[in-house]
Amino acid sequence: MKLSPTPSELLDWYDRCRRDLPWRDPGVTPWQILVSEFMLQQTPVSRVLPIWCDWVERWPTPSATAAASAADVVRAWGKLGYPRRAKRLHECATVIARDHGGVVPDDVDILLTLPGVGSYTARAVACFAYHQPVPVVDTNVRRVVARVVHGRADAAAASTVRDHADVSALLPKDSSAHRFSAALMELGATVCTARAPRCGLCPLSGCRWRQAGYPPAQGPARRPQAYAGTDRQVRGRLLDVLRDNEFPVTRAELDVAWPTDNEQRERALNSLLADGLVIQMTDGRFALVGEAG
């Protein structure tokens, strides 16, 4: 499998055009890269930036994060969404501090044993923190490969084995593999985008999709996920109340957060309890997990 133009041209483009993201700076630690990967899951970079900067200043190491209360960690997560990630990140820090001497593992298989770390995150940490030549495949990378290599507007259904094989075949056989992986991701995020690709700016403008005349995607258009009125929104409103209070709150205080649908509010609260993000005190009040009552 061959890219056109050469990997060096993609890397030259990356050096000129990449975004200035702090987790790419020299001196950033593997832990701080791991934190960024947790936060960037399903969350735009613009929302992650201020939270990540505050986080790594407050808790620069796994041990510092593990020593914090789970409530403080969930509170610091703010409005990044999917707050179970905050709880899992705290659990991950605890395991690293306790079982790995406070050092983020560099082995993909060991990384996969950590709480909240899946296939993508394990490989991203091995690649970007430890410069290992492992395939790192996210939605953006799959789209770039689909267009450049396979001549399709959209990627086929995800297949870990096939996707990793596609990207592995593209990786340079030298020490630049980690930068090449970052460049593929950057290209998909900023140029080879899903809805309005800027092919005139692409260093891989000889891609097969372009050569084929930009054939449209097959199948139904993907609809963006709704948020307004969903249980996710209700969960967020309830968590806002709990984050804004240093002490447990009553059910009546939570009711105010979503007064229009009692059944939906109760369902959202029960899901927060089931996820371990919220606890109910013996007196019936509610608090963030780990809150000192």
Question: Where do the protein language model's features map onto the residues?
Answer:
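Short amphipathic alpha-helical interaction segments
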Residues: P259-L273
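Catalytic cores of DNA base-excision repair glycosylases
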Residues: S4, S8-E9, W13-R235, E246-P248, ...
